[in-house]
Amino acid sequence: MKQLLAGFMLLSFTACYQGNTKSEDGYKTALSFAPGEESKIEAALLSLTDSTRITLKEGTYKFDNLSIAQLKHILIEGAGAGKTVLDFSSQSQGGEGIRVTDVKGFTINGMTLKDSKGDLIKINKSEQVVIADLHAIWSVADSTSGGYAIYPVMCKNVLIENCYAEGASDAGIYVGQTDSAIVRKCKAYKNVAGCEIENTSHAEVYDNEFYGNTAGFLVFDLPDLSKKGGYVKAYNNYLHDNNERNFAKSGSFGSTWGVGNAAPGSGIVILAASNIELYNNRIINNNSNAISVVSGFFIDENAAAKMNDNYFPIPRNIHIHDNVMQMDTAFPAAVYEHHTGKVLVGIEQQLNAMDPSRKNARIPFIAYDGITTNVLTKGTAVNPDSLCIQQSGPNLFVNINAMQMKDKGWKPSTDITPYVCK
């Protein structure tokens, strides 16, 4: 734990240094451009040298795509989100709006990116990355939108701060296969997932607002990737009204592990991720489920065959405490057309059929698939994977007993006793 805290202190210091460098003497080269000089900007990026500050003045710039690679100490700054706008709507080639690869010390802040065909900004294999005061938006939120609005992947030491993402057909703010990341004071609206932490270790997500998405916040570990995630904390977030239709691209549905599996009305979903702590969050009016904790087996019966050093399908060491959770009186309409959504509806119906005293109560706030390491070890231990819940109130928890869902005698259980923190 001391090493973890020290790492985050170092990240915070590094991030503040990179993001707050304002004087030109912090960079060997300072370049400044205005709208209408797009060709000069593209040429400058092709010949960019280490330690360069690029200032984009207020106005709208139209680009096909921009690329930066194999550099150190680079700053791209605008006049502010909504003031400096990079418009990729006429893009004729390239997937991303901005692609950054192998840059050590990269900061981008103070601008809006909009309407690329693929991801709006993808930062790959880079270190000491700061994305601040950035809006990343698609004008139309549907399956034609790019997958990720803000997308650092395979990076180290990432700070995403005071950003806004809208319209992504996968995740508005996504951090993938990264070591050490902070997402704070951001907003995500009208995406499939507001924010996703995937196969990422040592991440903190706090003081954010994720609302009006299909699902508010996802913590996923997926197979066949180069890095194992874990040690993720999410706290002081406001996740509300995430009830919208899942408009992920078709290849993201079913057993292909994509975000298409996220049911409309999901607040937080933990999938096959371990060492996770959720606390002091307000999880309000996500009307299918506040928190779901599920294994890889929940969406792929062959998950065991995918196990290796970077992937273990059972979530372990999950600590849920001191969250405020509320749901409305009914599922969102979109849930009835979604494959995972139909499962959640079935759980609620089965609980109420089993126990008329529930008087048609809603599905409990926390849903656990109940698939444990016992399926791998043939053991019989109760709560062998340390799901630890410290929450109070009625209708709090359901163990879905997902392995028996297809059986006639299937009985989900609302007994939280084995999972109350000792």
Set out the residue ranges of the language-model regions.
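Sec-dependent signal peptide recognition
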Residues: 1-7
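C-terminal motif of bacterial Sec signal peptides marking the signal peptidase cleavage site
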Residues: 14-15
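Right-handed parallel beta-helix/beta-spiral solenoid domain characteristic of secreted/periplasmic
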Residues: 21, 27-39, 53, 73-117, ...
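Extracellular beta-strand/beta-solenoid scaffold signature
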Residues: 41, 88-99, 115-122, 143-152, ...
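Short, T/G/N/S-enriched strand-turn elements that build extracellular solenoid repeat scaffolds
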Residues: 41-47, 62-70, 76, 87, ...
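Right-handed parallel beta-helix
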Residues: 73, 77-83, 104-115, 127-140, ...
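Acidic, glycine- and Ser/Thr-rich low-complexity intrinsically disordered tracts
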Residues: 299, 303-313, 321-422
